[in-house]
């Protein structure tokens, strides 16, 4: 009896790493592959991955930045320990390949796979390569990038995006005959965004009627944000901690106001929705660079956080009529690269056939 091929996915920390990994895993499961995950027990993958029917192994590893002198002194020993933990999991399960999608777990996991003679495939979701992927790229058999600029020569394939988002009807079909209030979806990513939670109630109070709002506030923030809208006198608002059916929310929206994490940018494009991006402040402008191509093609606007004011954001929203929003949505959909999951899955299959 022929043995099924096996893939170990290394990804954790945020939805931007985990969801693309799940998308690739699903493609390979459809081809009969067995999938196992390597993650950390205290991050979102510990709860999310098993819900998708995938077993997960854990290692103990944390980031190195901003942890103080004691942490930096201990870091080499903790990294070595994490590599040995990962190597033990790999030896026990014997994967045919490993896929690194980012997060702290990918570093020790990728090195352990390399030491074990297992081919490593990397996918960098952001326009600026993370520290882990920057180093792992030197030992990986295949490297992909979602946006130009992360690596010099790696193929640009976009981000793996959930199938229900890709399958949404064309923006023309969804939006052409809409009338009435402009629908604004506010999203701060899986962790929420305090700056959006604080700013949007004031923005909508200034804009007045003619809008409907759905606001994803993040864990533990929904009551506070709901109260802020009430105190600002804003009606027609739904506030939630999380959005379970994100595809349905994209289909509903005329405009997104959101961060520009890698997965959000790719989903906005795949769905075909115009956006105003408020990038998270980072020293290498990672989120701003993620969204640059959508701004350049007319699919989005961007206000970097130091320039964000209630007046400025309200003014930008006020300019966007239905014709402009439809045009932005069409440009977003035209810029989408929706087959990254298949491209990465095919590369993994090809690598294992060469062994």
Curated annotation (Swiss-Prot):
Gene3D superfamilies: Glycogen Phosphorylase B. Pfam families: Glyco_tran_28_C, Glyco_transf_28. The keyword Electron transport does not apply. Its EC number is 2.4.1.227. UDP-N-acetyl-alpha-D-glucosamine binds at residues 14-16, 126, 162, 190, 243, 262-267, 287. One of its GO terms (biological process) is cell division. GO terms for cellular component: plasma membrane. The keyword ATP-binding does not apply. InterPro entries: GlcNAc_MurG (IPR006009), Glyco_trans_28_C (IPR007235), GlycoTrans_28_N (IPR004276). It is a peripheral membrane protein. Keywords: Cell cycle, Cell division, Cell inner membrane, Cell membrane, Cell shape, Cell wall biogenesis/degradation, Glycosyltransferase, Membrane, Peptidoglycan synthesis, Transferase. GO terms for molecular function: UDP-N-acetyl-D-glucosamine:N-acetylmuramoyl-L-alanyl-D-glutamyl-meso-2,6-diaminopimelyl-D-alanyl-D-alanine-diphosphoundecaprenol 4-beta-N-acetylglucosaminlytransferase activity; undecaprenyldiphospho-muramoylpentapeptide beta-N-acetylglucosaminyltransferase activity. It catalyses: di-trans,octa-cis-undecaprenyl diphospho-N-acetyl-alpha-D-muramoyl-L-alanyl-D-glutamyl-meso-2,6-diaminopimeloyl-D-alanyl-D-alanine + UDP-N-acetyl-alpha-D-glucosamine = di-trans,octa-cis-undecaprenyl diphospho-[N-acetyl-alpha-D-glucosaminyl-(1->4)]-N-acetyl-alpha-D-muramoyl-L-alanyl-D-glutamyl-meso-2,6-diaminopimeloyl-D-alanyl-D-alanine + UDP + H(+). Its main location: membrane. Pathway: Cell wall biogenesis; peptidoglycan biosynthesis. It comes from the Bacteria. It is an enzyme of class 2 (transferase). NCBIfam families: murG. Cell wall formation. Catalyzes the transfer of a GlcNAc subunit on undecaprenyl-pyrophosphoryl-MurNAc-pentapeptide (lipid intermediate I) to form undecaprenyl-pyrophosphoryl-MurNAc-(pentapeptide)GlcNAc (lipid intermediate II). Belongs to the glycosyltransferase 28 family. MurG subfamily. This is UDP-N-acetylglucosamine--N-acetylmuramyl-(pentapeptide) pyrophosphoryl-undecaprenol N-acetylglucosamine transferase. It comes from Vibrio vulnificus (strain CMCP6).
